C-alpha cells in the first residue's frame, strides 16, 4: 500500500470488485427538471451478458450528488446516454454489444421504462450499432446524435465502424423509427493517415460556430502517443455525411479516448473533459493512457485551452479515469467517471476494466485558470 492507495476520488456511486470479471462501463448523467441527478452505467466483461442482452443500472441523487440510490435496471440496454427532452427522461443506445439501435422513455424519472418492441415503440434501427453515452444536440428544429454503424465486411474492432448521424424533429414522437433520419455511413478507410488510421468512433454531434452540424469523432491510430480527432461534415437536411481526409483530421488532446463536447452559451465556449498523455508515456498507444483527466475549452473547435487538471494517478496500468459524461449545472460542471482504482482486493483488473463509478463536480468552471493551449493549423470545415 502507498500514499495513493484507497483514496478513491469523488463520490462512489457503485463499486464492483474485479474478481467478478464484470466491469463498469458507459457512465451517463443528466439533470431532471426537478433538479435531481440521474446516472447510469452498463456492465461489460466475461462476467456480464453484454453480447446477448446489455444491462444498464440507473441511479438517482436528490442532494446534488452527495449520495446515490439505485432506482432501476434496464435489461436490453447498452452503451447508452440519458437525456431529458420536453421534461421527459429518455435513454438511447444499442440493445447489447453491437445490437439494434433503441430508445426508451420514462415518465416517472427513471424507475420504469418503455419497452422498444417494434418500430413505433423505440426500435429505431435493426442491425449492429456502436456508440457511447454521447451528447444530444438541438439545432434547426431537430435533435441530433452521432452513432456508428457496426455492420461490415469484418468483425475486427475499429475497421467495422462507420460514422453516421441520426436526427429527429423536436416535435416528433422520439419512440417512432419513422421520426428519425439517418445520414449515409462513412466506413473506416485504413489508407487514411498514410495507412496508420485504425478507427473512428464515439462521435459527438456538435454545432460549429458557423451553424453547421458536424460529427466530431475519437480516432485510433497506429502512431504511438498521437491524439487526433476527425471532423465529419453533416448536411443541413441530415441526410449526407462527408469527409475530407486532407483537412478532416485535427490534433486534439484526448482524441484517442472517449470525450464529449458541449457548448456553453454564457461563456461562448465549447467545453470537454478528456484524457491527456503525461510525460513518459508518449511511447504508448494513446488509447491506453487514461490516468490523467483534464478540462479543456475552445471558441472554434480547433484551438483548445487547458483549463484544469481534474484527476491524476501516476500509474497507467491499473488506474484510469475514463468515459466521462458531464453536464453544465449553473456555475458548475458535474461529471460521472468510469474509474479504475485501488480497493482492498488488489484494485482494478487493469486501467480499462473499471471497478468504480464515481461522481465529481467542477466548481465555477468558467473561472478555471488557463494552464496552457493547444494550437491546431487544421480547422474543421
Predicted regions and their residues:
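Catalytic cores of secreted/periplasmic lytic hydrolases that degrade extracellular macromolecules
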Residues: 261
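Short glycine-rich, acidic/polar surface loops and turns
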Residues: 321-324
